[in-house]
UniProtKB/Swiss-Prot annotation:
In-chain residues carrying the UniProt-annotated modification Phosphothreonine: 724
Biological process, per Gene Ontology: regulation of cytokine production; regulation of immune system process
Lineage: Eukaryota, Metazoa, Chordata, Craniata, Vertebrata
Name of the protein this chain belongs to: Zinc finger protein 574
Region (Disordered): 239-301, 434-460, 687-733
Segments of skewed composition (Polar residues): 247-257
Length: 896
């Protein structure tokens, strides 16, 4: 089983995670039954509306006469309306009714109610138990309850029973602290919507209602509304990535604006000073003395079970005796305080998990986007964002795994889940949270880089696509554009290599970079078995086998395998050299070339020998130096170009033109059966067939090998010099498909033809920024600029002499090997370089030209003598008459 299939199985088996302890479960029944273990089983004081099907008992132990709702049989509770259900399937069906009710177009038509209330039927209402008023939202209901709480004195509690379901216990996975909070949701025409008479309500003894508190298990902060509690919990646990980018980006900008910055966590304070409590509608943060006074004034109706939930040292509320015991242990053993941010934690395990956030220890990596997480639960929750069909998707773009949280979120948009209007983000405003990288002291561009894409000046994006405003790249989904902007343009480099200190944008990049230190290469090429340290490098390498170069320059037609290489190449056409040397003023268009240039100013190269004071610019040169000089062994040399390498593996990795010509030909033409060495050559060969036409077939046999340019003697056959020029039998012409219109020379690729045409047009698109000299090819400019920079990157492994051009190094190596591959066909003398042979051949050419001039002079002298001899005798009259018309026709004047 592959790694990808294993992750898929893991994702299927662990679809549900407990929001309290992050434990994973494979089914909904397991996680719901597990979450009941977090619900406290004490006898809470509940004054509420009971369902007729639920048993109601009196708590006689406390003597208060309050009603306690038993929930042993109904273990599954809906957090939307508080109704208790018997099985997970019933809970899901019940929650689906909420979805249909909140979406008008999907609602099931209901029977007409007997009496239509004045409010809208599509709104869920909240009823006040005192005055029977209905409200459309929890916020309005809560504000109304505040007026009753401030105006009503405290009296003996009395039960209030109505005919509709209520929340009798705490929600699953949340903290419910207060005990006398009751409310009812009434729907138009729904059952159990009967309101008692006014006489019955006047006889009721109204009690002081304590508000429900939702306590965060991470920071102990209390909330009144479940929606606020869920929104706060999202600050501790990352939510899934939304499918639509724009709403999420707007929320991020609004949440991070300086005018309104939300506080996700309270200020870190010692455990003895925690004062997060809300009673009787008063503000959170009263002192301990005031809380104890209010608790004493409320009477002893709380019972012993309620008093056990208060810490005697700091008067903090807790949900269960287990949490209280853990808190008391923090008083005995001391609080667990973070040494970096001074935040206090109740247990050492929570502190260890928090310290992992500071150290960026994320052991669970997402294989899709490279983001890292500290726990497997967070990774699995994040992986759901990559699924094509999220479980619950909101029209605003957010996705949810939990249906209850999805229902709470939809209520924030209003009726039917319609998104609220949001203010669009200005295009030029940067993404919040990702600051611009600070410029370095030296080597940074002094001017902004010009756009290198051909689509920069194009019009608006095509319908259904999203264009990046920085690089004009288009994407099919808004989520892809978001990830591109965050991880390419704005993401800061916050992941550091522990060995060399290099910074990276993603954790996965650090992981791939560490393989350069360890030497691990776990990704081999299936074609040549060459290993690589990352899948991206393997994908780039495989382009060399296929011959594909998808990135082509629009100015010179040169193609590249990487988009970054094309962008750097186009800087040459744009005359943009942003990287300037501070010492000599020479500019470069690539930062690594500036870095290599600086070594020549300092005189110290990065790779130093440990046994001698010599240093080298390349690691390969250092390894060859240690092998030859210190170890006394011979390096591995390339038989084609003579380059030396320290190992056979490095020699196999080396690629040169001569070795490529000798490579086995594995690509066969389907028309003529010819085999070539690469897919690019096969494509050019097939183009030659297409250019030849359907009636012509290229010769299957290759033509006779042409003699090298150095061994071909210039042929001179002057006509009329006393000899006849014999033409050699013409070989069958082999067309290649691309022909020069000026000189009819054939080429196999479009790039070669465009470079050749510059010879006829005189175009030189690569000028030198230092001296102004222009060149036809970028490689010629690159070699020329080394004359200005003094850079000599090609050093001999034997004597250490450095050269600016690799060809000069190859010629220099022949001094040590004694090789002389270039021989003169006239005299047989051999040379180490082609330039020396060319100079020698000029002497033979001069001798040949002198001989030709001598032959011409002798021929002219012989012709002159013949004219002088024949001009003495006069022509007969008849012949003169015949010659005269011919002479006039040719424009020759005959004297005499």
């Amino acid at each position: 089983m592959t790694e990808e299939s294993e992750e898929t199985v893991l994702y299927i088996e662990h679809r549900y995670v407990c929001s309290e302890c992050n434990q994973l479960y494979g089914s909904l029944e397991e996680v719901l039954m597990h979450q009941n273990s977090h619900v406290p089983q004490q006898h809470f004081e509940l004054v509420g509306v009971a369902d007729p099907g639920v048993t109601v008992a009196t708590d006689t132990a406390s003597g208060t006469g309050l009603y306690q709702t038993l929930v042993q049989e109904s273990q599954y509770q809906c957090l939307e309306c508080g109704q208790l259900l018997m099985s997970p399937s019933q809970l899901l069906e019940h929650q689906e009714l909420h979805l249909k009710m909140m979406t008008p177009q999907e609602a099931v038509p209901a029977e007409p109610p007997p009496k239509a209330p004045p409010l809208s039927s599509s709104t869920i209402h909240y009823e006040c138990v005192d005055c029977k008023a209905l409200f459309a939202s929890q916020e309005l209901w809560l504000n109304h309850r505040q007026t009753h709480l401030r105006a009503t004195p405290t009296k003996a509690p009395a039960p209030v029973v109505l005919g509709s379901p209520v929340v009798p216990g705490p929600p699953v996975g949340q903290a419910r602290v207060a005990v006398e909070h009751s409310y009812r949701k009434a729907e138009e025409g729904g059952e159990g919507a009967t309101v008692p008479s006014a006489a019955a309500t006047t006889t009721e003894v109204v009690t002081e209602v304590e508000l429900l508190l939702y306590k965060c298990s991470e920071c102990s902060q209390l909330f009144q509304l479940p929606a606020d509690f869920l929104e706060h919990q999202a600050t501790h646990f990352p939510a899934p990535v939304p499918e639509s980018q724009e709403p999420a980006l707007q929320q991020e900008v609004q949440a991070s604006s300086p005018a309104e910055v939300p506080v996700s966590q309270p200020d870190p304070v010692p455990a003895s000073d925690h004062s997060y409590e809300l009673r009787n509608g008063e503000a959170i943060g009263r002192d301990r003395r005031g809380r104890r006074a209010r608790r004493n004034n409320s009477g002893e109706a709380g019972g012993a079970a309620t008093q056990e939930l208060f810490c005697s040292a700091c008067d903090q509320l807790f949900l269960s005796p287990h949490q209280l015991q853990q808190h008391l242990r923090s008083h005995r053993e001391g609080v667990f305080k973070c040494p970096l941010c001074s935040r206090v934690f109740p247990s050492p395990s929570s502190l260890d998990q928090h310290l992992g956030d500071h150290s960026s220890e994320s052991h669970f990596l997402c294989v899709d986007c490279g983001l890292a997480f500290g726990t497997e639960a967070l990774l699995l929750a994040h992986r759901r964002a990559h699924t094509p069909n999220p479980l619950h998707s909101c029209p605003c773009g957010k996705t949810f795994v939990n249906l209850t949280k999805f229902l709470y979120h939809r209520r924030t948009h209003g009726v039917g889940g319609v998104p609220l209007p949001t203010t669009p983000v200005p295009p030029e405003e940067p993404v919040i949270g990702f600051p611009e990288p600070a410029p370095a002291e030296t080597g940074e561009p002094e001017a902004p880089e010009p756009p290198v894409s051909e689509e920069t000046s194009a019009g608006p994006a095509a319908p259904g696509t999203y264009r990046c405003l920085l690089c004009s790249r288009e994407f099919g989904k808004a989520l892809q554009l978001t990830r591109h902007q965050r991880f390419v343009h704005r993401l800061e480099r916050r992941h550091k290599c522990s060995i060399c200190g290099k910074m990276f944008k993603k954790k996965s990049h650090v992981r791939n970079h560490l393989r350069t230190h360890t030497g691990e290469r776990p990704f081999p090429c299936p074609d040549c078995s060459k290993p690589f340290n990352s899948p991206a490098n393997l994908a780039r390498h495989r382009l060399t086998h296929t011959g594909e170069r998808p990135y082509r320059c629009g100015d010179c037609g040169k193609a590249f395998t990487q988009s970054s290489t094309l962008r750097q190449h186009r800087l040459v056409h744009a005359q943009h050299f942003p990287y300037r040397c501070q010492e000599c003023g020479v500019r470069f268009h690539r930062p690594y070339r500036l870095l290599m240039h600086r070594y020549h100013h300092t005189g110290e190269y990065p790779y130093k020998c440990r046994e001698c004071p010599r240093s080298f610019l390349l690691r390969r040169l250092l390894e060859v130096h240690q092998l030859v000089v210190h170890a006394g062994r011979q390096p591995h040399r390339c038989p084609s170009c003579g380059a030396a390498f320290p190992s056979s593996l490095r020699l196999r990795e080396h690629r040169c033109a001569a070795a490529a010509a000798q490579a086995p030909r594995r690509f066969e033409c389907g028309t003529c059966g010819k085999k070539v060495g690469s897919a690019a050559r096969l494509q050019a060969h097939e183009a030659a067939h297409a250019a030849a036409g359907p009636g012509e077939v290229l010769a299957k046999e290759p033509p006779a090998p042409r003699a090298p340019r150095a061994t071909r003697a210039p042929v001179a056959s002057p006509a009329g010099l006393g000899g006849t020029a014999t033409a050699s039998p013409a070989a069958p012409a082999r067309r290649r498909g691309l022909e020069c219109s000026e000189c009819k020379k054939l080429f196999s690729t479009e790039t070669s033809l465009q470079v050749h045409r510059r010879i006829h047009t005189g175009e030189r698109p690569y000028p030198c920024p230092d001296c102004g000299k222009a060149f036809r090819q970028s490689t010629h400019l690159k070699d020329h600029r080394r004359l200005h920079t003094g850079e000599r990157p090609f050093a001999c492994e034997v004597c250490g002499k450095a050269f600016a051009i690799s060809m000069r190094l190859a010629e220099h190596r022949r001094i040590h090997t004694g090789e002389r591959p270039y021989s003169c066909p006239d005299c047989g003398k051999s040379y180490r370089s082609f330039s020396n042979l060319w100079k020698h051949r000029k002497t033979h050419q001069q001798q040949h030209q002198a001989a030709v001039r001598q032959q011409l002079a002798e021929a002219e002298a012989a012709v002159g003598l013949a004219v002088m001899e024949t001009a003495v005798e006069a022509l007969p009259l008849v012949e003169a008459i015949e010659i005269y018309p011919l002479a006039e026709a040719e424009g020759v004047q005959i004297s005499g």
